[in-house]
Amino acid sequence: MKVSIIGSTGRVGRATALCLAEEEAVKTLHLISRRESLEQNIGEVLDMSDALAAKGVSVKLENSADIENVHGSRIVVITAGVPRTADMDRDDLAFQNGVIVAEYARQIARFAPDSIILVVTNPVDVMTYVALKYSGFHPSRVFGLGNHLDSLRLKNYMARHFNVHVSEVHTRVIGQHGPYMVPLISSTSIGGIPIEHYARRDYFSGYRRFDLKKTIEKVINAGSNIISRKGATEYGPAFAISNIVTTILNDERRILTVSTLMEGEIDGIRDVCLGVPVKLGKNGIEGVVPVLMDRDERETFREAASHVRNSTMKVMEFLDEELPL
């Protein structure tokens, strides 16, 4: 199947391209850049071709600066946008990136009307809403990377703390991809044992030293921490994107936490895009999976909805003047 990446010369776009090129389900990978970055885009394809040959991988690689070449794509990944700096809040990007995402969403709807759109551009929850409205697609076919990467980060930190394999940690982060993210600690388990039991029994000596508040702060600040040291996040987002894309192409029906339009499924929240667990299959989102939250988690989730909704309304009002629907 064909997958297109818009913004393929950016650091996340490049890393994502290499990840997806190695996936058997991806038969054609089309990399789209701005016209002024076309030479770099060509170079990326040539370099990637050599790498894939060394691994014995055969995939058709294409590149262009023309958005109409998304035609025939099963999935279009939008990574294009102004990158975030370490001292910049994701919401600071909203107005600039809103214009970029809105324009691309319109063109995707025109040239690839049957495709699925995966939004990566930050602030991802707001940009997912923008892409949804400007594409006119059904919500099942437009969603964002959301809290999938945040969930993986939390799993990783907890696995390292308790010295267990990451697959033994079952946890999830929902809400906003940002300060209002909600780690669902109340339903977290390690090796099938609810984490709350670790406080009552000596399963692992590390439990009493586990600082939940610091761990949550670590997840929230993970992106900024990486950006301040190397200038951008690349590999984490790329592999998380690859998880989502291959889940769809292989019709795996996995439950992943992505940013999607809320329509009352959780706590009656509507008309805002938030990270929640969904079942993903070949046609996109097959349904939102209900979650159990304690009182504090529910309160933070509602705060996330309020914050993201306010940010989204401001961006949509701005876009209504710049790019009327």
UniProtKB/Swiss-Prot annotation:
Enzyme class of the recorded protein, top EC level: oxidoreductase
Keyword NADP tagged: yes
One annotated GO molecular function: L-malate dehydrogenase (NAD+) activity
Catalytic-site annotation from UniProt: 177 (proton acceptor)
One Pfam family, short name: Ldh_1_N
Binding site for substrate: 84, 90, 122, 153
Keyword Glycosyltransferase applies: no
Domain of life where this protein originates: Archaea
EC number: 1.1.1.299
Keywords, sorted A to Z: NAD, NADP, Oxidoreductase, Tricarboxylic acid cycle
Residues annotated to bind NADP(+): 7-13, 97, 120-122
InterPro entries for this protein: L-lactate/malate_DH, Lactate/malate_DH_C, Lactate/malate_DH_N, Lactate_DH/Glyco_Ohase_4_C, NAD(P)-bd_dom_sf
SUPFAM superfamilies with a match to the protein in the record: LDH C-terminal domain-like (SSF56327), NAD(P)-binding Rossmann-fold domains (SSF51735)
Listed NCBIfam families: PRK06223.1
Family classification: Belongs to the LDH/MDH superfamily.
Protein name, per record: Malate dehydrogenase
Name of the encoding gene: mdh
